[in-house]
Amino acid sequence: YLMVITSSLSVYYLPRLAEIKSDVELRNEIFSIYKMVIPFLLLATLGIYGMRDIIITLLFNKEFEGMRELFAYQLLGDFFKIASWLLAYLMLARSMSKLFVVSEVLFSVSFALLAMCFIDMYGEIGATSAYALNYFLYLGVMMLVFRKLLFAKK
């Protein structure tokens, strides 16, 4: 499901963001995409979570039943990841390459550090909880970076 969303973002959303000149139109496009993507993402996430036992049985074997506990944080992280990417794509569309690279490197390092700490504290579920927290923080940073655009008064 992530591949469907990211492919759509690359094919439609990124070129669309690049061609928009007006901040008002850009803001409207961003909110329009959120209104389209978030419901799909919620349905997909809830569907996968609800069918996690079936998915594990079909794709793996009984030895992997323990991974069912990892789904919640993984899917929550995926939700925050896509929500943050909808804003991060603005950096690419607006030639903010340096900021994009710095933020990607910074949050890759933060994920590694969070994962090491959380795995030590919580075991294997620490990896997926670190992933969810990392992308929650990334979404917060993207909202901070684009706060003037997102929260501008009409």
Task: Give residue ranges: language-model regions.
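Interfacial segments at transmembrane-helix termini and the short loops linking adjacent helices
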Residues: F31, Y49-F79, I125
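Membrane-interface helix-loop junctions in multi-pass transport and translocation proteins
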Residues: S108-G140
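Membrane-water interface segments that mark the loop-to-transmembrane alpha-helix transition
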Residues: S22-T45
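Membrane-interface junctions at transmembrane-helix termini in multi-pass inner-membrane proteins
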Residues: A18, L76-V105
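Transmembrane helix-bundle signature of multi-pass secondary active exporters and lipid flippases
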Residues: Y1-V11, F40-A44, Q74-K81
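C-terminal transmembrane helix end/exit motif
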Residues: L9-Y13, I82, L86-L90, C117, ...
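Helix-loop junctions and terminal segments of transmembrane helices
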Residues: M3-D23, L90-A93
